[in-house]
Amino acid sequence: MTDYLRSTALLLVLLNPFLLIVYLIDVVEKLDRKQFAKVLTRAGLIATAVFWFFAVLGDTVFSDVMQAEFASFQIFGGIVFLLIGLQFVFRGPTTIDILRGESQHLAGAIAMPILIGPGTISASVIIGKRHDAIPACGTVLAAVLISILIMIGLKALHDFVRPKREALVQRYIEIAGRITALFVGT
């Protein structure tokens, strides 16, 4: 049981909903709660399917299909995160708009650069090594579900607090954005 909790915590830490909500602040402000929940649920389903794929197939995808070492993928992912962190430092919150791009399908645009990345894929591979296929998939589902539910709750909190405390919300976004730059860059 402890291994399952550790595996869930591993992915949940990487899917940090308190950090992800800052990335999605433009979506939080534009969509109502029902639309936001619908888009985020779709993005969560896309991410879960990708994580399941890597949890079940693991190193096989890298060694046999891509013919690359898993460690090389992790190094590449670190370099990508370093570059994104530098973009956050120099460009601020507009960086996420550049990463996400103009997408007609918002769920896919949220899933790929925000939920699915080198860190979460690596965590899925590690979870797949720790557990058999079905428990690994359950662990991944639990982590993604918890993250999505927390973000929906944060959207509700944002909608409740924003009309009364606009300056406080903007200050939180500014501070969290700076912390994000440090976190992403490390």
Where are these regions (language model features)?
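Small-residue-enriched transmembrane helix starts and helix-helix packing motifs
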Residues: M1-L14, F90-A111
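Membrane interface segments of multi-pass transport proteins and intramembrane proteases
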Residues: S63-A68, G153-E174
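Juxtamembrane transmembrane-helix termini in multi-pass membrane transport proteins
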Residues: D3-F53
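Transmembrane helix exit motif
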Residues: I79-R100, G185
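Small-residue-rich segments of transmembrane alpha-helices in multi-pass membrane proteins
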Residues: L45-F51, F81, Q104-I121, I173-T186
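Interfacial loop-to-helix junctions that mark the boundaries of transmembrane helices
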Residues: T2-T8, S63-I75, H131-A142
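Membrane-interface alpha-helices at helix entry/exit sites of multi-pass transporters
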Residues: D32-I46, A133-A142, E174-I175
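Membrane helix-loop-helix hairpins that form the core translocation module of multi-pass transporters
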Residues: A37, T41-F88
